[in-house]
Swiss-Prot record:
This is Probable anti-sigma-F factor NrsF. Disruption phenotype: Growth not inhibited by chlorite during aerobic growth, slight reduction in lag-phase when grown on minimal medium with lactate and chlorite. Up-regulation of the SigF regulon (Dsui_0156 to Dsui_0159). The chain crosses the membrane at residues 27-47, 51-71, 91-111, 126-146, 159-179, 187-207. Induction: Part of the SigF regulon, induced by chlorite (HClO(2)) under control of SigF. Part of the probable sigF-nrsF operon. GO terms for cellular component: plasma membrane. The keyword Membrane applies. Probably an anti-sigma factor for extracytoplasmic function (ECF) sigma factor sigma-F (SigF), which responds to (hypo)chlorite. ECF sigma factors are held in an inactive form by a cognate anti-sigma factor.
Length: 213
């Protein structure tokens, strides 16, 4: 075999290697980001001391399910917005249904509760810190997701930044569930959502500058 033929064959083989898909990129970004958020939570907040008992409570899993569904919906939005011309018809439903479901549970809880208990169900004991802590834990996830998104082709940078921030906030909220003692549906439906919307708002601001072609 001639040297020129060998070089041509090797070049053709190298060109056949496919770049990672968008789903693979984001899976890796979420994995690394979630690991960073978990380490941050363990270093600064620690796992709640009664986690074993909390795992037996249905409302704990409702809380985890809510933020996990929002993370899945946000990932769907991120994948759609990373492709030029991709349809986003189902994005509002993917993001809105988990929120509406939690708000329905929260409304039922408040209606059934005694008037004196409603304030505690909404504010809990950690309303001042909860949104800020979720936003703090979202930083590693947000950085990883935003880095992956920059390598793709979002054509609506502000909306893409919002979706990236919401995904980061939702993944951070899943991690925060291991620390947070709150189980009231009204608390989760408002303060958790606020914590996830903080990085989403930051994503809107950063998207126009960092994700523009």
């Amino acid at each position: 075999m001639k040297t020129e033929d060998l070089i041509t064959m090797l070049a053709a083989g190298a060109g056949a290697v496919e770049a990672p898909s968008a789903a693979q990129r984001y899976a890796l970004a979420i994995g690394w980001g979630a690991a960073g958020a978990t380490l941050l939570m363990l270093a600064l907040l620690q796992v709640r001391h009664d986690l074993g008992l909390a795992l037996l409570l249905p409302m704990f899993w409702v809380k985890v399910g809510f933020v996990t569904c929002l993370a899945a919906g946000s990932l769907f939005a991120v994948l759609r917005l990373s492709r030029p011309g991709a349809k986003t018809n189902w994005v509002p439903a993917a993001l809105g249904l988990p929120v509406l479901g939690m708000w329905a549970i929260a409304a039922f809880t408040l209606i059934e509760a005694e008037p004196m208990e409603r304030s505690n169900l909404f504010f809990g004991d950690t309303w001042k810190s909860c949104p800020l802590l979720i936003a703090m834990l979202s930083v590693p996830v947000f950085a990883a997701v935003l880095r992956s998104m920059k390598d793709l082709a979002p054509t609506r940078p502000r909306l893409a930044g919002f979706a990236a921030g919401l995904l980061a906030g939702a993944v951070a909220a899943v991690v925060y569930c291991l620390h947070c003692p709150e189980l009231g549906a009204p608390f989760i439906g408002f303060w958790y959502l606020l914590g996830m919307l903080i990085p989403a708002a930051v994503g809107v601001l950063l998207g126009n500058s960092m994700l523009r072609w």
